[in-house]
Amino acid sequence: MKLKLAFLAVVLSYFSHAQMLSSFEEVEKLRKENPKPVVVLFTTEWCGVCRVQKKNLSKLPQSTWDSVYFISINPEKYHKDIEFFGKKYTFVSNGTSGLHKIAYELAGGRVPAYPFWVFADENGKMLTHEGLLKEKELNSIFFNHNH
C-alpha cells in the first residue's frame, strides 16, 4: 500500500489542485480547451467508507480544487453515456440496479471496491486506487511537491 501511494504521489505531484465538476461532459469540454489532469472518485450510497472518504476530501483546503479537474459520481446511479479520453462508456442496467461501464472497465473488467479512484494525466494515462485514502494520504498525493 505504501509503495502504491508513493508511486501515486510521484505521478500526481503536479496535481496540487483540482477543479470540481458535475458531469463528464463538462470534464471533456474543459479538458479539451485547457488540458489538465483529471481525478475521478467513484462512490456509492451504501458504502460507509465512501462517506468517510468524502469527509476527508471536505477537509482539504478550497484551493485544492484549482488546477486538476475533479468529478465524483455514483456508478450505480449515473445513467448518462460518458466519453472519457475518447472512449465511450454506457450504463448497464440489470433491472432494479446496474453499473456504469466506466467503473467496471477502469477497474480491469470487474466491479471495483469503493471508493474507487482514477487519476489521469493530460494524455489519458491512468492509475487507479481502490479503497480509502486517509486525510494524510490525500495531502501527500495532492501536496507532495510543495513539501
Show which residues each predicted segment covers.
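Sec-dependent N-terminal signal peptides
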Residues: K4-Y14
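Boundary at the C-terminal end of the N-terminal hydrophobic targeting segment
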Residues: S16-A18
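Thiol-based oxidoreductase modules, predominantly thioredoxin-like and allied folds used
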Residues: M20-L21, W65-S97
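Short active-site neighborhood of thiol/selenol oxidoreductases, capturing the structured segment around
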Residues: E33-C47
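Structural recognition of the beta-strand scaffold that forms the well-ordered cores
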Residues: V38-L41, F70-I73, F116-F119
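C-type cytochrome heme c attachment motif
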Residues: E45-V52, F116
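Typically the conserved alpha-helix immediately C-terminal to a functionally engaged Cys/Sec
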Residues: R51-W65
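Non-catalytic, surface beta->alpha helical segment in thiol-disulfide oxidoreductase systems
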Residues: S93-H147
